[in-house]
């Protein structure tokens, strides 16, 4: 008789990694779209810096903490305004620090409403929309992810399938029928 193991939530480092990859990808896609809109460049050259991994991963992990503290206290509109203000603060702080080492990958000096070339008011709406997407899609779904110790090795299921004791051709009708597995290692509630 198999014992049930409660799946573990993702660690902070695992969530940080997912947030970093998400931010990095969005940065590349945004710069590609911006290049197309501004210069009608059909090559869609999306660019970013490796620093974006640290910047986005840490920023979104902090937004996650804010979400957990604020979700029962204020509505989504107010939360997204708070996230946007935090994003400006974080972008300015990390940009200012990186500029000390000549490593800041962005410069908003050409924008009319920039401050020290590190932040610009023209990005308020995109940052607000990004905050909404991050809360509603990224953070909420990432917090639902679980490590499933049982599915650590795909070999266990293969052996059960070959021996007739597993799900085999009856996929979805076993004891784990209600569980959904993203890739055999991560389980979503």
Swiss-Prot record:
Pfam families found in the cross-reference section: ABC_trans_CmpB (PF06541)
Keywords: Membrane, Transmembrane, Transmembrane helix
Ranges per topology, Cytoplasmic: 1-17, 65-75, 136-189
Transport is among the record's keywords: no
Compartment(s) where it occurs, according to its Swiss-Prot or TrEMBL record: Membrane
Keyword Transmembrane helix attached: yes
Regions annotated as coiled coil: none
Similarity annotation: Belongs to the TMEM229 family.
Name by which UniProt lists this protein: Transmembrane protein 229b
Organism: Danio rerio
């Amino acid at each position: 008789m198999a014992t049930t193991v409660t799946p573990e939530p993702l660690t902070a480092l695992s969530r940080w990694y997912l947030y970093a990859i998400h931010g990095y990808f969005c940065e590349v896609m945004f710069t590609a779209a911006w290049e197309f809109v501004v210069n009608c460049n059909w090559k869609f050259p999306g660019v970013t810096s490796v620093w974006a991994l640290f910047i986005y991963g840490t920023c979104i992990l902090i937004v996650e903490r804010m979400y957990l503290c604020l979700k029962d206290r204020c509505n989504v509109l107010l939360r997204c305004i708070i996230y946007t203000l935090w994003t400006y603060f974080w972008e300015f702080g990390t940009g200012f620090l990186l500029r000390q080492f000549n490593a800041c990958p962005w410069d908003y000096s050409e924008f009319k409403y920039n401050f020290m070339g590190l932040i610009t008011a023209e990005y308020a709406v995109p940052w607000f929309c990004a905050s909404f997407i991050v809360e509603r899609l990224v953070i909420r779904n990432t917090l639902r992810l679980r490590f499933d110790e049982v599915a650590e090795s795909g070999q266990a299921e293969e052996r059960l399938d070959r021996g007739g004791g597993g799900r085999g051709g009856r996929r979805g009708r076993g004891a784990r029928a209600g569980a959904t597995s993203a890739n055999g290692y991560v389980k979503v509630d």
